[in-house]
Amino acid sequence: LERGKASAEREIHIYIREGKYYLDTPLVVDAGEWKNKRLTLSAYNNEPVVLSGARKLSLKWVKQKNGIWKSKTEADKGDQLFVGGEKRILARYPNFEEGTIFNGTAADALAPARVKRWKSPGGGFIHALHARDWGDMHYVITGKDDKSILFEGGYQNNRPSNMHDKYRFVENIYEELDAPGEWFLDGKAGYLYYYPYPDENIDNEIFEIAEIPSLIEIKGIENDRASDVTVRGICFSQTSRTFMADYEPLLRSDWAIYRGAAVFIENAERCRIEDCEFTGLGGNAIFLSRHIDGCVVKGNYIHQIGASAICIVGDTSAVRSGVFKYEHSVPYE
């Protein structure tokens, strides 16, 4: 990309050879740096190319009790772990049960007797349905006192509500690491804990942990729009989860939105995302933000992701007397 920006050529085609490329920051195509150029990013000759938001870990396992192994790690963050390319389960209660709401919920997820077992739950997550089953709400645990845990969040839903008293679960808590396939990262101490499946040889597996939420950002501004960028034939994978990122309410709708994605396009014209794959993502796959004209999203395979496949969201500044929270209204005069 740096060579392309500096080139005098008007047509820039960057071919990417077969392989998996781990990014620690997103690739950014900024309108101000690509004026009057057409850019194409594509896999070379249909070779398999993966852009990953994960870090590949180098681990030396030491056996612990109760089926758990641990290893020192340089990773200090991450809430999606992949073993041999397969996503594993962040330590949770109740345990994972495929095909159920949230893959398992329990009314006693926050019961005092259970909370009392948690030595240091800060950084854990609570996931729950809206009290009237209208959607999901998410919270981060900030600590605990003598009586209960402390937490914040729930802003992903634009209809204020308590969390559901039955459909809820907790995760990312060390004391809940008790089933095959579960894991926990102690980022402060620098240890990864894992409970392998019975037939899993962890010394021979590749461990990867997702660290960034975005892989490509194509960005312009209102008076200087990004244009003529094509992304073709690339697999985007292993981004971090975004449910606790900043969310925007959208004109009294039931929901709020995280303005970001694995591929994020903002204030752009004539851009194309085609024949790509999006999988193993922690959030949105493709986001078309604010002014978008003549852009095409075509032929992509989007599966096993954490949020929406394709978002098209304008700018609320285009609305006069906008009302954002569900409970607000504009007086009639």
Give the positions of each predicted feature:
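Low-complexity, polar/charged sequence tracts that form flexible coils or short amphipathic helices
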Residues: 265-266, 278-279, 288-289, 302-303
